[in-house]
Amino acid sequence: MLTGKNALVTGASRGIGRAIALELAKRGAFVVVNYNGSEDAANETVAAIKAAGGDAVSVRCNVSDFTACQEMIESLIKEYKHMDILVNNAGITRDDLLMRMKESDFDAVINTNPVSYTHLTLPTILR
């Protein structure tokens, strides 16, 4: 059981992230549903968690932005005292061959996928 644990799930407004958030809540964790796109979809995830007897909130944060991640983690620690579980689920793709991909698209993929993990874990590790 995860009762008393706080979990942050990135990209939790839909798909795999939503399923992970629902499962963590089912096991007793308080879940922070991170999203960057649809607030409505994130709120639907929170509502589904609450309807199943769990507890959750939604928080918008572009995980490719280091400063935004630092601010989100600091805010969560201030509000909830500790974050015990981090599920780095957020990810994007730009469907094109690397040789035809625009630099901005490449940067967005790299900054959201592997780099965001550092953005989210570093502020916590340095505490």
Regions found by a protein language model. Give the residues of each.
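The beta1-alpha1 cofactor-binding region of Rossmann-like NAD(H)/NADP(H)-dependent oxidoreductases
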Residues: 39, 60-72, 103
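Conserved glycine-rich cofactor-binding loop
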Residues: 6, 13-14
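Substrate-binding pocket helix/loop in short-chain dehydrogenase/reductase
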Residues: 97-98, 102-110
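Conserved small/polar residues in nucleotide/adenosyl-binding loops
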Residues: 118-124
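Structural signature of the Rossmann-like NAD(P)-dependent dehydrogenase/reductase core
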Residues: 9-10, 88-89
